[in-house]
Each structure stands twice: as C-alpha cells, then as structure tokens.
Amino acid sequence: MEGWRITLLNEQEKTIFVDADACPVKDEILQTASEYEVQVLFVASFEHYQLSRSNEEKWKYVDPHKEAADLYIANHVKPGDIVVTQDIGLASLLLNRNVSVMSERGRLYKEDTIDFALEGRHFSGKQRRKGVYAKGPKKLNKEDRERFITLLQKILSNDEGILH
C-alpha cells in the first residue's frame, strides 16, 4: 500500500534532532524528513536566531552557553530518534541510547569506532593548547551532501521496514 503509513498506538513519533548552529545540510534534512513524514527539530543558540526562518522549520533556541544545544538534545532524544551533529562528544553520549547519530558529511557514528574519534579529538585539543593548529575541515562538497542524503534515507527506510 504505497503512500500509506500505519502507526501503532504506542509508537512515538520519530524526530530528527539537528545540532543546527553550524549545520550546512538543513535544506537536505527538511526535504528528506518531508518525504518520510518525520518531525525535525533544529536546536541552536539564541546567538543564531533569525526572524526570517520559515514557519515550516521547527526551531528550539537555547542559551548561548557552549554546550547548551548538546545538553538540550541529550535530554530530549528518545530511542529511535536521529541526531545530526558534528560533535563527537555528543555522539558518544547518545550511541548507547538506541539513537542513530550521523555527521553532516554522511558518516554514521558507531559504538565500535567512537573511542578512536574521541582519542583524536583529545589529541587535537592537546595540540591546540600547545599552539599547534591543524587545518579545519574541508568545505562541504556535492559528494558529502549526496552521502548525507543517502545515509539519512537509509536510516529512515530501515526504520520503515524497507531494507537496503
């Protein structure tokens, strides 16, 4: 029955939480979420508030504290939700809570690789404290965007029982 969706009475609506302060794939998230009829919640600092945001987009603004968006997301996700973030610390916090966590570049964070990512983040922090700075991430390109959309569709399709 194409186009029909059956929701069990005890099934909670899935939400895509987006760590939105510097997220470059907001449009891709909205488009894909619309196709799968999934709620989206963009979480951002009040420092990034804009009056021009579309009414279709759902935004939650939090204090400008460094970790406020992460804490909001961590406190509001539920099993089955999806989180889009580039924050490795937030990803590590959510992985054991049955939440799919992915980067803006279309990489799925996994429990068996998150420790390595955390070690890399720790090493980079130590280097910065010594005054050694690495280049920042490359600008998001078309392939990154396509990989992101493909992974998000795969997660949502698998959740709907459509296996890839």
Curated annotation (Swiss-Prot):
The cross-references to CDD domains, in alphabetical order and at most eight, read: PIN_YqxD-like (cd18720)
Against InterPro entries, the record matches this protein to: UPF0178
Q: Which domain of life is it from?
A: Bacteria
Q: Which family does it belong to?
A: Belongs to the UPF0178 family.
| Matches recorded under PANTHER family | UPF0178 PROTEIN YAII
Protein name per the record: UPF0178 protein YqxD
The record lists the lineage as: Bacteria, Bacillati, Bacillota, Bacilli, Bacillales
Coding gene?
Answer: yqxD
